[in-house]
A protein has these predicted regions:
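Glycine-rich flexible loops
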Residues: 1-427, 439, 443
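Conserved glycine-rich cofactor-binding loop
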Residues: 433-434
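Conserved NAD(P)H cofactor-binding loop of Rossmann-fold oxidoreductase domains
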Residues: 502-507
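Substrate-binding pocket helix/loop in short-chain dehydrogenase/reductase
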Residues: 510-511, 515-520
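Active-site loop-to-helix junction immediately N-terminal to the catalytic Tyr of the SDR YXXXK motif
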Residues: 514, 561-569
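Active-site helix of classical SDR
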Residues: 534, 571-572
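Residue(s) in the substrate-gating loop at a strand-loop-helix junction
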Residues: 555
C-alpha cells in the first residue's frame, strides 16, 4: 500500500486550519484522517475512526487534557474540525475503574464531557481511544487485515506475519467492554505498533500523526504482501444462457415496491471482475458465512441473495428466491431479538443480489444508498475471496451479528435518512439542458429525485446541476440513440418513475406559405419524438408494475399560437390528443 503522506501538504493543512484557530495537533489529525478516509482499501462510508490527545484551555484559562475523536458516522474522507468533537480526557480515564457500563450511560457520560455541548456524538469507540496511551490513534477496516482476521486459524496466521509487532484482541462488540479489553492487552504489550481485532479491524498509534499513519500503511502492506503470495486453483462454471437483465431489474423493483410501497434504485454491475466471481463453482458457499466486519451489517445485512442462472428468466422463480430470503431473515430476527430489548425488525430485503454467471445488483432507497451497498459488497467480495486463499473464512456468530445489526448506537447512524416523499424516484427530463428543463431538474434534485437529462449537448448547462444529474447526449429523433439511452438508465437505476417530455424546437413560418418540410421537421421534433419516448417509457412503467408519471410540455403555442408560430403550435397541439 502506497504511503501518501506529504510533508508539504501537512504544512498546508496546519496553515489553513490556523486561520480557523484550529491547533496544529488537530490540523494534522484532520490531514491523516483524510489520507486514511480517501483510501477505499482502508475505510468506507463512515467506517473507521481516529483521535488525537491534546491540551486546551478551559473557560478559566486552565490547561486541560482533551481528546478529539471522530464523530459517529462522520466520513473520514472529508470531515473538518466539526467532525472531531473534543472531550475532557480525565473524566474518560476515570471510567477505567468501572467493571461495567451500559451503552445508554456511556453515551450520556460522553456527551456530558464534551467541550462543546452542540458537538455531534463522538464515536462509539471513544473510550477505546481514550484508554490507549498514545497521542494519535488510527482505526480502519482494511480489506487486507479483514481477510486475515476472519479465518478459522487467524491467530496462527497473524503471529506468523507480524510476530511481536502487534497484539491480537479477540472479538468483543464495540463499546465499554472492548475498550477495557484493549487497555488490558496494550498494558501487557506496550511496545507493539498496533492492535489487530479479530473479526473487526486494526488500530495503530504513535506520538505523531505521521508515525501512527506510517504504522497503519506498514502493517497493512505486510498483510497485502502475504495475501498476494497465496495461490489456489479456482474452478469456474460456463453460463452461456442469455438473460434479459432489464426484465430482471423491473421484476425485482416491482417486488420491492410491493413489499415497502417505496421506489428503489437497482443497479446492474457487470464489469469483468463483477462477472468473474459469479461463475465460481463455489459461489453458493462463498458468501453465506456472515459479514467481514460487523459494521457492514447495518448497510447490506449479513449476506447477499444468490439467484441461480437457470432461474433468472422466470419472474416467478425470482420472486420465490426473494420471498425465501425474506422468510429466512424474519426467522433470524425472531430467533435473536431477545438479545436487544425493544428491537423492531428492519425491512428484510437484500441489498445485494448476485445473479449467477452475469453480475450482481446493488440496491438502495436512493442512488447514494445504492452506491454504499455496492462499495461495501465490493470490499466484502475481495476480502472473502482473499481469505479463502489462505484458509477457511469464518465470521462472527449470528448472535453477535444480530447484536451489532440492531444495536441502537449503530441504528442511530441510519436515522433521518430517506424521509423525503419522492426519495428513490427516477426522473427523465428531455430537453434537459434548456432553461425549463434545468429548472425542473433543480427542483427534482431538492426532492431527492434521481435525475437523468437528455439533450443534444450540455455546453450551457449549469455546472452544479450537471454534477448532480446523469447527462446523456441524445437526439430524440434517432431511435437507436433513444434505445441506447434508456438501456443505460435502466442498467444504472433499474426503472423509471417520471418522464418530463420537455424537448422541442420553435419552427416558424406563416401558414399561408410555409413549406411542407418545415411542418414535417416540426412534427418530427415536437410530436413524433415525444410520442416515441413516451411510448417506450410508458411500457417500462407498465412492466415495473406500479406505473409512473408522464408530463408533456405543450407550451401555450398548442392552444394560443403567436404570429408565424403555426408550424410549432400544430405539432405541440398534436400531443393534446
Amino acid at each position: 500500500m502506497k504511503n501518501e503522506w506529504k510533508e508539504s501538504l501537512a504544512k498546508k493543512y496546519i496553515k489553513e486550519y490556523q486561520l480557523k484557530k484550529v491547533s496544529k495537533d488537530l490540523a494534522l489529525r484532520i490531514y491523516s484522517t483524510h489520507l486514511l478516509g480517501n483510501n477505499p482499501e482502508l475505510v468506507l462510508h463512515g467506517g473507521g475512526n481516529t483521535s488525537v490527545k491534546s491540551i486546551k484551555k478551559n473557560l478559566f484559562g486552565k490547561d486541560n487534557d482533551v481528546l478529539f475523536v471522530k464523530g459517529s458516522g462522520w466520513d473520514m474522507s472529508n470531515l473538518n474540525e466539526r467532525g472531531l468533537p473534543g472531550l475532557y480526557l480525565d473524566p474518560l480515564l476515570k471510567t477505567l475503574s468501572l467493571k461495567k457500563m451500559s451503552d445508554e450511560k456511556m453515551v450520556n457520560y460522553l456527551r456530558s464531557n464534551l467541550l462543546d455541548s452542540s458537538s455531534p456524538n463522538p464515536s462509539i469507540e471513544t473510550l477505546l481511544h481514550a484508554y490507549l496511551p498514545f497521542k494519535y490513534v488510527d482505526h480502519t477496516h482494511s480489506n487486507a487485515i479483514l481477510s486475515l482476521v476472519n479465518l478459522d486459524n487467524s491467530k496462527e496466521i497473524l503471529n506468523k506475519i507480524y510476530k511481536d509487532k502487534i497484539a491480537i484482541v479477540p472479538y468483543v462488540m464495540p463499546g465499554f467492554e472492548l475498550a477495557k479489553l484493549c487497555h488490558m492487552v496494550i498494558s501487557k504489550n506496550h511496545k507493539v505498533e498496533g492492535l489487530i481485532l479479530l473479526n473487526h479491524g486494526i488500530f495503530t498509534f504513535g506520538s505523531s500523526a505521521k508515525q501512527s499513519y506510517d504504522r497503519m500503511i506498514k502493517l497493512v502492506t505486510l498483510a497485502e504482501n502475504f495475501l498476494n503470495k497465496q495461490k489456489k486453483l479456482i474452478k469456474y462454471n460456463i453460463n452461456n444462457k442469455k438473460i434479459n437483465i432489464t426484465d430482471v431489474q423491473l421484476c425485482i423493483r416491482n417486488l420491492y415496491h410491493s413489499f415497502t410501497n417505496k421506489r428503489w434504485i437497482i443497479k446492474f454491475n457487470n464489469k469483468v471482475e463483477d462477472v468473474k466471481f459469479t461463475n465460481r463453482k463455489d459461489l453458493f458457499n462463498l458468501f453465506n458465512k456472515g459479514p467481514v466486519t460487523p459494521d457492514h451489517v447495518i448497510r447490506i445485512k449479513s449476506e447477499p441473495l444468490i439467484i441461480p442462472n437457470k432461474h433468472l428468466s422466470s419472474s416467478k422463480m425470482i420472486s420465490n428466491h426473494i420471498n425465501a430470503y425474506i422468510k429466512k431473515y424474519k426467522n433470524y430476527f425472531k430467533k435473536y431479538k431477545k438479545n436487544i430489548t425493544n428491537s423492531k425488525i428492519a425491512d428484510p430485503l437484500p441489498r445485494i443480489i448476485i445473479l449467477e454467471g452475469i453480475g450482481f445488483l446493488s440496491i438502495g432507497l436512493n442512488k447514494k444508498e445504492m452506491q454504499v451497498s455496492y462499495d461495501i459488497f465490493d470490499a466484502m467480495k475481495k476480502v472473502i475471496i482473499k481469505a479463502n486463499l489462505v484458509s477457511k473464512f469464518k465470521s462472527i456468530n449470528n448472535t453477535d451479528i444480530f447484536k451489532m445489526e440492531y444495536w441502537p448506537l449503530e441504528r442511530a447512524k441510519l436515522n433521518n435518512q430517506n424521509t423525503k416523499k419522492f426519495n428513490g424516484n427516477v426522473a427523465v427530463i428531455t430537453g434537459g439542458a434548456g432553461k425549463i428543463g434545468s429548472a425542473i431538474a433543480n427542483k427534482f434534485i431538492n426532492e431527492n429525485i434521481e435525475v437523468i437529462l437528455l439533450d443534444k449537448n450540455f455546453k450551457n448547462l449549469d455546472v452544479n446541476i450537471k454534477k448532480k444529474c446523469l447527462c446523456i447526449e441524445c437526439d430524440l429523433t434517432n431511435n437507436s440513440q433513444i434505445n441506447k439511452a434508456l438501456n443505460k438508465i435502466l442498467t444504472l437505476f433499474g426503472g423509471i418513475d417520471i418522464l418530463i417530455a420537455n424537448s422541442g424546437a420553435a419552427f416558424q413560418g406563416s401558414m399561408l406559405n410555409v413549406k411542407k418540410d418545415i411542418l414535417e421537421k416540426s412534427l418530427e421534433v415536437n410530436f413524433y419524438s415525444h410520442h416515441n419516448i413516451v411510448q417506450k417509457i410508458a411500457n417500462i412503467m407498465v412492466s415495473q408494475g406500479f406505473g409512473g408519471s408522464i408530463s408533456l410540455n405543450l407550451s401555450k403555442q398548442s392552444i394560443n399560437p403567436g404570429k408565424d408560430f403555426g408550424p410549432y403550435g400544430i405539432a405541440k397541439a398534436s400531443s393534446l390528443f
